[in-house]
Amino acid sequence: MSSKFPLGVRFITHSLPCTRLASMNSGALIYSFRSVPVLSKAFPFRLKYIGLGSRVNFSTRPERSQPEFARRSGAGGEIRASKSLIEDEAELSDWVSDLRTSSLRGKFTSDEDNADPEVVRRNVDRDTSRGPRRGREGQSDRFGGAKRGKEGEMDRFGSPNRRRTSGEPADSFGNKRLGDREGSRNGRVQGKSSESSFRGRSDRNVDSGSSFRGRSDKNVDSGSSFRGRNDRNVDSGSSFRGRSDRNVDSGSSFRGRSDRNVDSGSSFRGRNDRNVDSGSSFRGRNDRNVESGFRREPGSENNRGLGKQTRGLSLEEEDSSDDDENRVGLGNIDDLPSEDSSDEDDENDEPLIKKAASAKAVQTDKPTGEHVKTSDSYLSKTRFDQFPLSPLSLKAIKDAGFETMTVVQEATLPIILQGKDVLAKAKTGTGKTVAFLLPAIEAVIKSPPASRDSRQPPIIVLVVCPTRELASQAAAEANTLLKYHPSIGVQVVIGGTKLPTEQRRMQTNPCQILVATPGRLKDHIENTSGFATRLMGVKVLVLDEADHLLDMGFRRDIERIIAAVPKQRQTFLFSATVPEEVRQICHVALKRDHEFINCVQEGSGETHQKVTQMYMIASLDRHFSLLHVLLKEHIADNVDYKVIIFCTTAMVTRLVADLLSQLSLNVREIHSRKPQSYRTRVSDEFRKSKAIILVTSDVSARGVDYPDVSLVVQMGLPSDREQYIHRLGRTGRKGKEGEGVLLLAPWEEYFMSSVKDLPITKSPLPPIDPEAVKRVQKGLSQVEMKNKEAAYQAWLGYYKSQKMIARDTTRLVELANEFSRSMGLDSPPAIPKNVLGKMGLKNVPGLRTK
């Protein structure tokens, strides 16, 4: 009768060593067996404690010399006497004491590291043999990466490291011990020991073949090499940084090779193969859908929740609502949750406010040689070094490519440096941001350092911007100017990010300069502990785009902010226009002896002076086809086209973007219903790209600098004359030429009387090919019904706010239903009764309710 034993029982074999014969050599891998103490066989721990086991040589070069193993890897094997019980107990005691200080990593050595017995001993004790040394490339890090010059020795994952003594523990993954991770689901699964040990032993149904180079074979459940932990059903060989997700055919090797459909593959050099959604490289970049970094946290599943810290940059983990957004490729834009319902959607907008990332965002402001030649109208001959600025600031200005000042900077800087308040009227796109940032930085430099006892250092400069895009752009430019001022920090607080995240960031990072939008700044004043106290240290207050701040209804918030900062301060108001509302706020914000600087001379053209302007009048049912024809003609004439299309509302913006996407155009969209991180990414992509179309609402109308925009199309009625001018100002920036087209319906033509003084001419309609009409109709039929319904409702609400049109509500509803038919709908969508009540359109004929 056969006996059955539990799976956990292991028979105790004799302790006498087995002499190996020459015929037992296995080739490349030579296993040296020795006597195993009796207590170790009875000890209740399993493969994770392999300190008593033999060292395994994973050599791929068996012909190299191996001094330490030479005496026991020969044909004769190893002969030694059995150990006594006392020796066993002594060895066990030493091993247990090692448990307290070591990370329990399996001890295996690389052949190249075995040349010297002393080196071998030191490498085994400190677990330094993780990869082959790299010849003349300098001291290699733990995984074979060459250390770079005097940038500081790097540990195995790129963080600064000092030379350890042999007695110190050599931890990895942010000094997390392997023993701390035993609580995760990697490990024993349903009674199986799938610990992917360094002995190369495989569990049941597991083909362990993860090699020292991280190779991954077809249908191989490999025990991930180095630190890769093997999950159930994981085809993984992810080494160094590769994440091991379930059912992922991964093979991210030591050089970052990546198979298709790999969601990790973050390579040592940061290379990305197709369908790879990551690439967090050694330089600290964090691309979308990557939650990997330099530290592996204990108990993390599939390596989620990993953060990284490089050169002081702290990337927070994205929250779940951003995960859905990250799955949306920019080439195929889907609808995302509105900001109204998920205002705290994510925190991934931080890269734009970090010094390492700011240079890219600001390079568009560099006056290149071409700019200098074509933009004499706004550049002066005055150099920055003619003013008493910090040498480090001047060095950063030179690195940024600025040589001479703009007219705005030349006019405002001397007065501001004298300590006076300033109201400056200037053309859009002429360097207003640098004009107020440079003197603000000088104010920070001259301020006495905060006392060491102060837990919350004061905020010295407060910049208030009307939109998130403007705030992010201003913060990026500030970081560029602060390139050689490492002790001065810039933080940005804007809607669309979590309030606790911003609170944490301001507490842990330097924040002498704060850039904010009014609503979020008010939130911090009311809800952040100690924030109001920090604002009492403000010495410089800047209101950027002051006219726009007031147009957006922020007057009460601005008054609240002004009351929260000291009266003894210096204040700058910069604006493209100075209407009566701005003059009124001047009495509250500025001192009586403030200077008004008008950089727009009478008779000189505005930014749009070199922009060819035209308008077209067509019925609503022809607008979409007409837009398609205009775009096709412009693309045919301009290889490096860059087009911005402005729409009346966010939902109409989404509709137009969906339509153009169906027509196979390279299109992106930005509007208030998109999460802030999405808007930041798309804005940055559009800024750097060519041959691209951006469909946007008025969030991109002011101040945002997109270089080389060749065409601006405005679909529908602008809210007013100033909005038309600001939209048009996205092209023709910095002296370059551009083109603007305003597309109106016949009943919107009254708007032209407000811009009759501008050089805008009426253009005949281009011929529309019937085939183009069919393509547009087909594209509209493929747009989701919910998007059409939302666009109809938003369109109705927008034109209800236009007094000239909203006077006759019956006529307004007829026009809305005409817009509905232009989208290809037979009948207008139903609108909830409560929404109609808020619009003031209850019981109006022609509306359907639900």
Curated annotation (Swiss-Prot):
<feature type="compositionally biased region" description="Basic and acidic residues">
    <location>
        <begin position="61"/>
        <end position="71"/>
    </location>
</feature>
<dbReference type="GO" id="GO:0003724">
    <property type="term" value="F:RNA helicase activity"/>
</dbReference>
<feature type="region of interest" description="Disordered">
    <location>
        <begin position="60"/>
        <end position="82"/>
    </location>
</feature>
<feature type="binding site">
    <location>
        <begin position="426"/>
        <end position="433"/>
    </location>
    <ligand>
        <name>ATP</name>
    </ligand>
</feature>
<keyword id="KW-0067">ATP-binding</keyword>
<dbReference type="InterPro" id="IPR027417">
    <property type="entry name" value="P-loop_NTPase"/>
</dbReference>
<keyword id="KW-0597">Phosphoprotein</keyword>
<feature type="compositionally biased region" description="Acidic residues">
    <location>
        <begin position="315"/>
        <end position="325"/>
    </location>
</feature>
<dbReference type="GO" id="GO:0016887">
    <property type="term" value="F:ATP hydrolysis activity"/>
</dbReference>
<dbReference type="GO" id="GO:0003729">
    <property type="term" value="F:mRNA binding"/>
</dbReference>
<dbReference type="GO" id="GO:0009507">
    <property type="term" value="C:chloroplast"/>
</dbReference>
<dbReference type="Pfam" id="PF00270">
    <property type="entry name" value="DEAD"/>
</dbReference>
<feature type="modified residue" description="Phosphothreonine">
    <location>
        <position position="109"/>
    </location>
</feature>
<keyword id="KW-0547">Nucleotide-binding</keyword>
<dbReference type="InterPro" id="IPR014014">
    <property type="entry name" value="RNA_helicase_DEAD_Q_motif"/>
</dbReference>
<keyword id="KW-0694">RNA-binding</keyword>
<feature type="compositionally biased region" description="Acidic residues">
    <location>
        <begin position="336"/>
        <end position="350"/>
    </location>
</feature>
<feature type="region of interest" description="Disordered">
    <location>
        <begin position="106"/>
        <end position="350"/>
    </location>
</feature>
<dbReference type="GO" id="GO:0005524">
    <property type="term" value="F:ATP binding"/>
</dbReference>
<keyword id="KW-0347">Helicase</keyword>
<feature type="compositionally biased region" description="Basic and acidic residues">
    <location>
        <begin position="118"/>
        <end position="140"/>
    </location>
</feature>
<feature type="short sequence motif" description="DEAD box">
    <location>
        <begin position="544"/>
        <end position="547"/>
    </location>
</feature>
<dbReference type="Pfam" id="PF00271">
    <property type="entry name" value="Helicase_C"/>
</dbReference>
<feature type="domain" description="Helicase C-terminal">
    <location>
        <begin position="630"/>
        <end position="777"/>
    </location>
</feature>
<keyword id="KW-0378">Hydrolase</keyword>
<dbReference type="InterPro" id="IPR011545">
    <property type="entry name" value="DEAD/DEAH_box_helicase_dom"/>
</dbReference>
<dbReference type="InterPro" id="IPR014001">
    <property type="entry name" value="Helicase_ATP-bd"/>
</dbReference>
<protein>
    <recommendedName>
        <fullName>DEAD-box ATP-dependent RNA helicase 26</fullName>
        <ecNumber>3.6.4.13</ecNumber>
    </recommendedName>
</protein>
<feature type="short sequence motif" description="Q motif">
    <location>
        <begin position="382"/>
        <end position="410"/>
    </location>
</feature>
<feature type="modified residue" description="Phosphoserine">
    <location>
        <position position="110"/>
    </location>
</feature>
<feature type="compositionally biased region" description="Basic and acidic residues">
    <location>
        <begin position="284"/>
        <end position="299"/>
    </location>
</feature>
<comment type="similarity">
    <text>Belongs to the DEAD box helicase family.</text>
</comment>
<dbReference type="InterPro" id="IPR001650">
    <property type="entry name" value="Helicase_C-like"/>
</dbReference>
<feature type="domain" description="Helicase ATP-binding">
    <location>
        <begin position="413"/>
        <end position="596"/>
    </location>
</feature>
